[in-house]
């Protein structure tokens, strides 16, 4: 069961925003405070907005509307694909193809080409269609490129009515196309984002893997519930005093611009200022873990 409580959000690092110098002032209503050079997101607002988004997404999908999940940053790719497939919806988790929405007819031709090549691969007809090994290799490379870019939307017959985005600042082109065509946009918005571009903004860390996974799992459940599937009801709770949030923060920037996070009394890990994400591991003493593989 997805639990969107202040305690759970704290444990997954949702409250960590970006450096204060990188913030978008329009995020002010969702910022609790600033500590040691970074903004701390108000998790009471996160819980409230997550519930609003869940209810709206459930209602919209119950009306037959389709969802396109978008998240091309490394931290989001796996969860985007997993939760889109689980909810039987569509996804883009690598490069956003410019014009995917606004030039849909052209994209449909590329999807048709992808399906043709997949059919050739399935019945081993590459060698029958072309004469040389070089041509076969060229076709296989084309297939892999199309599959990587369009594989998550190859069964998308029409433009969807809803887009769910991880990091709308990074996915700026996708958001612009969606707004132009009137799609309902749901998004996790960090402190450097413009929430006014989003119909249903959810304030939170859009860099931490566990935070991203929590949001996507919850919203995927909303889609499943809306389309008649059976999922455990998520729990939305504001059961932790928000003033405790800033007190849990243990990090600071050193003189070289490195972000220092206490992992234990005997060791420290640093993270460059250009990589703002961090996750918190629950323990008696707050511990912050950096995703070293990302």
UniProtKB/Swiss-Prot annotation:
A Pfam family annotated for this UniProt entry: Ribosomal_S2
Protein name (database record): Small ribosomal subunit protein uS2
Keyword line: Ribonucleoprotein, Ribosomal protein
Region span, Disordered: 256-294
CDD domains in the cross-refs: RPS2 (cd01425)
InterPro entries named among the record's database cross-references: Ribosomal_uS2, Ribosomal_uS2_bac/mit/plastid, Ribosomal_uS2_CS, Ribosomal_uS2_flav_dom_sf
Example of a GO cellular component annotation carried by this entry: cytosolic small ribosomal subunit
Source organism, top-level taxon: Bacteria
Annotated GO biological process: translation
Biased composition (Basic and acidic residues): 256-274
Example GO molecular function: structural constituent of ribosome
Name of the encoding gene: rpsB
Ranges of biased composition (kind: Polar residues): 280-294
HAMAP family, per database record: Ribosomal_uS2_B
Family: Belongs to the universal ribosomal protein uS2 family.
């Amino acid at each position: 069961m997805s639990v969107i409580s202040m305690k759970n959000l704290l444990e997954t690092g949702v409250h960590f925003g970006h450096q204060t110098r990188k913030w978008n002032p329009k995020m002010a209503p969702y910022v609790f405070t600033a500590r040691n050079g970074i903004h701390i997101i108000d998790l009471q607002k996160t819980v409230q907005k997550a519930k609003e988004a869940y209810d709206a997404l459930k209602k919209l999908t119950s009306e037959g509307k389709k969802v396109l999940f978008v998240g091309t940053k490394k931290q989001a790719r796996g969860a985007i694909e997993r939760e889109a497939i689980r909810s039987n919806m569509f996804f883009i988790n690598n490069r956003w193809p410019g014009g995917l929405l606004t030039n849909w007819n052209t994209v449909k031709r590329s999807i048709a080409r992808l399906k043709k090549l997949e059919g050739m691969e399935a019945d081993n007809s590459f060698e029958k269609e072309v004469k040389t090994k070089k041509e076969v290799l060229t076709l296989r490379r084309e297939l892999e490129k199309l599959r990587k870019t369009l594989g998550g939307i190859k069964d998308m017959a029409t433009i969807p009515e809803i887009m769910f985005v991880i990091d709308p600042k990074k996915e700026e082109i996708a958001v612009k196309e969606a707004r132009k065509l009137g799609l309902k946009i749901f998004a996790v918005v960090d402190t450097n984002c413009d929430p006014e571009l989003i119909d249903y903004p959810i304030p939170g860390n859009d860099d931490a893997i566990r935070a991203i996974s929590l949001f996507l799992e919850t919203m995927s459940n909303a889609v499943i519930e809306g389309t008649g599937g059976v999922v455990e009801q998520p729990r939305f709770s504001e059961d932790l005093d928000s003033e405790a949030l800033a007190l849990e923060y243990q990090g600071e920037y050193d003189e070289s611009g490195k972000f220092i996070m206490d992992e234990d009394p005997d060791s420290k890990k640093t993270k460059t200022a250009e990589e703002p994400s961090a996750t918190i591991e629950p323990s008696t003493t707050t511990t912050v873990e950096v995703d070293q593989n990302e």
